[in-house]
Structures are given as C-alpha cells and as structure tokens.
Amino acid sequence: AYQCSADIIYERGYPVTINAEDNTHFAAEAAEKVTPGVDRDTPPIMAGEDFSYMLNKRPGAYIMLGNGDGPTVHHPMYNFNDDAIPAGCSWFAEMVETRLPSVG
C-alpha cells in the first residue's frame, strides 16, 4: 500500500547493564545520608533491563531500593512495601540536591 517499504532490525534481549563506578558510588553515598543499612556489597545480578540503552549513551547507575523480604518486583505475589516510600523519595531528593547547583 502507498508503495512504501521499511527495513526492520529486530534484536532479542537487551545490552548488558553496566553501572559507571563514580555514579554508583555517588548514589550509595546519598543513600547513606538518608537511611541506615545501605548494602554496598550487593552481588551483581544478571538482569535484562531496558535502562541499559540509556547507560550506553550516558554514564549512570541502575540503583535499587530495598523493599524487605518477599517476592521480587516481577513475581505475581509481589507487594510493594509502602514503608519504603519516604526513604526512596529522600534518597532521590538527596541526589538531586547534591548534584544541582543551589540558586539564591
């Protein structure tokens, strides 16, 4: 129809998700300012993540907020722990406030 054509490149899976060391360190330091119990010794995981496309363009870090014991995020029995919201919001606010220049 309409004499159009398209070339499609379909690739299965995602690129490897690799955190930039300095961004990971920055995120951990920010977390330690707002909450106790930051685990810097979390073992690497082999997860497919579309965020890896962003990390291929700009340095960054795929960071995780602890949510207690129980099923993980993609499990059908997963239940987000609302008690983690204040710590998570404070963590992100700390990173933003630290990185952005103050105005005024």
Which residues does each PLM region occupy?
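Metal-dependent amide/peptide-bond hydrolase catalytic core
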Residues: 1-104
